[in-house]
């Protein structure tokens, strides 16, 4: 059925059957299309069709499941169009609604709901909110600690003394973190107990035979390979230099020693040889003909190797068996106590959930696992009867994004797949054994494997969620590519997304830096991406750009003097990079004039000008960087949106509302109270707040207000307040002297607060918050501020959070505030509300993780000079899923504390795994680009850094693994790989690098390395400041009183510039401004255009809000932008589209009333609507900028002087569409029409510039121009 031309490899992935099939699909390889096609071929097979509900398809997200279901539905529908009588197709279309295409969590929930009777859970269970779970966990751990303190549990007390700080919160954090970590293990109690038992060693313990010892040896061998390269490089220099051949023998001995170590497989031998080795002394011969530079160079290299070997000796010397044994024996009680403490906590937390009939997200997988597994008499984990039923039911189990599976999910999938074998614990680790097991009931078709797994281990970036890429890698290394095998793999590495320039660059870089050590996979030619996309020859691809700037660049005194600034005023590093990126974007986009980048539009099937929406800025993390980048881009007039997960709780409107809720709960909190008092909710001035505080400095601010309130109201003070008042007469005098307006203000606020406190008890929290929005007018006030739409959206999010909270098992304002605080600190804040649609023409800033699965014409990867986050390595107890616990050794009696030897091993292992994850994250970032890739980063001391890069270029094919292991930033990897590339020659010359490179790589990838000048960016900042300062000076002079200098000041200020008229010409005009200018030229009396400005109340203070004509026009334009004409056959369809905009909060219900479905339908059924429907190229709300002569607008200017003056016209075209013989331009108008000719004259000039913009941007002829008038439901053609 599919018209797609599949590659041979794709066909293998689609049609191979009767085996376990692993599909390794590189970035852009079309894995989703292949997976969908495989399903379609299965259900429409003419020989043995499989009903779609007999397939289990597991996806990573709900969106992916929905997309897959939609694609399959489209394919079936297309088949029915071709064969309407097909019973098979009709059946599959019916079964599609109950198909098992879902996320792993959805499948687990299905299993639980169908088999709840086998578990001790209520069938009406609810999945608890994440923050509700956090609150319950905190309750559980507080209660558990209190109980253990009360009974004075000795193990617990020792644990607190060893691993808690002054408070026990640090130990609580350890327990909560270990609990979360353990839940990624299939049988978490077993894992916890096994990891503690690793410390329970006897006299026979031999560290040299443990996995830890092997790990130390393998890690050190990576470094030794680096030392080997350095020594080999030195020997090459000795043999090719004059007069230093006497160095050859000692260097050869050193190299033999390193080679011998690399061949060792026994830790004991390895350790012994390193400790025993003494470097031979270098001969002290003097040879006047010796090449001194070469001699010094090899000595330096050898000294470096010697120093590193001494460090390894010292480390290995500490790994003495008896010492390690004593450490283990000492730590065992604490580690056992820790495991037991986590188990006790889990049981208490489970009890709390059961009381409320709740389960959390971890429970979903673990409950499913317990339903699907049994243990046989030998203790092996085998499928339960329920799992066997699923094995019979599912003809095939298909798993998407397999590289992101964790071990719990892997065991679950193995239980419902037809695989031979069982799971069992070996040395504390759960492992799969592919052996025959005896099942009481013979398994149907067990001999025919039925598992399909697709993913890309190079894109496994969710280790922080306990994803285990080793699951994929183990199969990838074991499975065969040969046909007919039971376990087979297929490789899809042809990339159908990116230009060859992007692919070649990605391949070059990762061949240089990715390995089994860092990245967990060797990036060989076999693993490399292959070019599959065709972009034609019309527009040539561009090289990948690397834009670097030295953040420690010293600014000379001359420069500081020239620009009159202090060095401290220089832009900070993030600002610098943000400004650099803004400049790159400006150059890429241009002003829709000449010079902008052209990109291929898949929908149009042709090249067009680059738009802002085509660009994404990717960052490793957006929390601190994105807001600064947004500011820098906005300064350059670049529309931008940052998709962040932070900043929400720092917005003024949310801080104010949370402060209000805090004082309603408890007004005796000075900081939130003052926040509310200074806000528009209460509007107290600083002077008024000082007057209130003067009542008494020793009590809370609210108590001061309460005293004023009571005395002013002639109420008697109770004993509590009397206690704090030493001199009541003095207080009375203060209050008597107080401004009457202030006293009334205080009384009004106190009374409101008391009313709010009372009301908060009687209504749900979500209703109460909305009541406060309306009662205080704060929601309306926020909307009237700059970025009001965003602020109101943030307030709605708080309301939604309250609604979510109201459904939990917690009630009341106090608990809601705790709920918000836990959300703030445990979930790492949240991003502000999203108010932009997917098609808005803005540059997007997002994290690399959020970009996974997406693609963009232009990708800018920024922040590559930022250090990797290794803060987790500093915790006092580390956890590793395979190696277990890595605690500090803490002896409270002797007051000794240091990292245990096993902690150092685990710390290094986690560091390597983190670096591997960072490597894959970098791969994901670079493979998002379709046509253009730009990398930006700041370097600390450019000259030294580049010199270090050059020293790592001895191997042209690979950056040394030890160098990659020691990398702290992405640039530490990218730099050494690129510095030896042929395209780096000019960059090295620019830096005056004299070192000769013998290993220049002549690779087909194309790179452009730019060194950006910090001085130029500093200059721009100074120029901005000069404008601001001149405005302030002008303002100061305007306020000068009469003085002896009046005449001189007047004379200087009255100076008239020769081209003064030009200064009044704006550099940019909107089309509306142009229209007004032409009307002004025609009217002698401008009174109608510029009426007296009348101040009016903000909308939120008015009793009734009426939508203005301009707002009405905006709403209708917004609806027309989002109108889908294909789904607008009747008024009900129109209403449904209106409701969708309301749901997505693009418009409110009140605003929706101005959209008349009947009028919209008339447009859709009219001639223009039909023509739009028939067009294959329809564009809406297209912004533009075009350059025109200033004389064209300002005809009064001197033609000779201003003949070369230009200005930019900006506007937004409502709609244009393409027909065979040209473009059709359409502009919507909601004005009331008296005279058709008047309307034509009014908008003629506007349409003229729209036409000119379209001509320039598209290069195509505009054949027709129309105004559609909604007031009369008709259109006017503009000649």
Swiss-Prot record:
Residues 526-853 form the UvrD-like helicase C-terminal domain. Coiled coil: none annotated. GO terms for cellular component: cytosol; DNA helicase complex. Its EC number is 3.1.-.-, 5.6.2.4. ATP binds at residues 25-32. SUPFAM superfamilies: P-loop containing nucleoside triphosphate hydrolases (SSF52540), Restriction endonuclease-like (SSF52980). It catalyses: Couples ATP hydrolysis with the unwinding of duplex DNA by translocating in the 3'-5' direction; ATP + H2O = ADP + phosphate + H(+). GO terms for molecular function: 3'-5' DNA helicase activity; 3'-5' exonuclease activity; ATP binding; ATP hydrolysis activity; double-stranded DNA binding. GO terms for biological process: double-strand break repair via homologous recombination; recombinational repair. Its cofactor is Mg(2+). The keyword DNA-binding applies. The heterodimer acts as both an ATP-dependent DNA helicase and an ATP-dependent, dual-direction single-stranded exonuclease. Recognizes the chi site generating a DNA molecule suitable for the initiation of homologous recombination. The AddA nuclease domain is required for chi fragment generation; this subunit has the helicase and 3' -> 5' nuclease activities. HAMAP family: AddA. This is ATP-dependent helicase/nuclease subunit A. The lineage of its organism: Bacteria, Bacillati, Bacillota, Clostridia, Eubacteriales. The gene is addA.
